[in-house]
Amino acid sequence: MSISFDLTIDDTRDQLARHARASLEAKPSLIGMSREEMAAALIAAGVPERQVKMRISQLWHWLYVRGVSDFADMRNISKDLRAMLAQHFTIARPEVVEEQISQDGTRKWLFRFPPRGAGRPVEIESVYIPEEGRGTLCISSQVGCTLTCSFCHTGTQKLVRNLTSEEILAQLLTARDRLGDFPDKDTPDGAMVPAEGRKITNIVMMGMGEPLYNFEEVKKALLIASDGDGPSLSKRRITLSTSGVVPEIYRTGDEIGVMLAISLHAVRDELRDILVPINKKYPLAELIKACREYPGLSNAKRITFEYVMLKDINDSLDDAKLLVKLLQGIPAKINLIPFNPWPGTNYQCSDWEQIEKFADYVNAAGYASPIRTPRGRDILAACGQLKSESERLRKSERLALEAMMIAGHGE
């Protein structure tokens, strides 16, 4: 659902009012519902209770295995039931506003989701990173972010709202559409994807937002993504990255059970307070304690610690020594991330020689410490560069949106 803004405010007031009312009365999506929620929704829509289990099984297969986005394509469901489902529910994909392809094959999509309640349409970014033998989709959990990490582009955008489980899963489903990763779908000509098997083999909750500040919706989405009768992604291939929301780290291990990544970036509280301000609430001692107690932690299920390399800020050998000491005894991998510049930042990337010295010290201490190859820099798709276009709407679009909401509330 989208709006054309190439109209004057006076001429479009009635259209905008109708759109606002339609937004408030939008049909619920079946995507992102748990089986229990779907059962309740189907019964409320008139599906006989004795049929519900079978219908959920059919819908689950069509939505998550076959990847259909129109009830009409569900061929083993009667025409009458398909019509009833279409009357009460939607399974539509978000609007793909823009798709950018980097020189290295990385793809970035700008997705637009319809309003929620009295809100306005929102936009988020997702990134696909092809590698030898696998393809990773970086998914967003919020529109904007509250954490204000000083080196992160997304952190400069205010939080608009949390994404729903539907919107989180829609990023995966739409990316699979675009890559031809569903049966009977074609891969775009020239697309860089794994030669065999799935195009999307891994997902990482490392896009816009702090996933653990949207715990319930993220949990619901990831449990569906790992469902053996649905997308069927192994929990070993799903990584949730957090800046350190300590109480929910424990819940993540107990209730979701996916791989954990920590946006660390500093080994001294006084510096991390600046780089990652949530450290003031959950300092390093509390964060590391939660990591040591993460359920299932082992050499086969290591925690990934992300460490952005900032010139003359956190890249000294003393920092490397403190890092090794801090993580002692934790099965871990340390991703060293060359800082990815973005417009307006005051930080610089560490010199490559210094990054290698840092990596050599950490590696010699027994920790895998790969230097992450920057991907998608030319399309602002690299780590720390994501930022939706929602804050960059043209003035005319903002005015039209405001008029739409005013008109809707004035009826």
Swiss-Prot record:
EC number: 2.1.1.192
Highest taxon in the source lineage: Bacteria
Pfam families in alphabetical order: Radical_SAM (PF04055), RlmN_N (PF21016)
Cofactor binding summary note: Binds 1 [4Fe-4S] cluster. The cluster is coordinated with 3 cysteines and an exchangeable S-adenosyl-L-methionine.
GO cellular component terms, semicolon-separated: cytoplasm
CDD domains, sorted: Radical_SAM
Protein name: Dual-specificity RNA methyltransferase RlmN
Organism: Brucella suis biovar 1 (strain 1330)
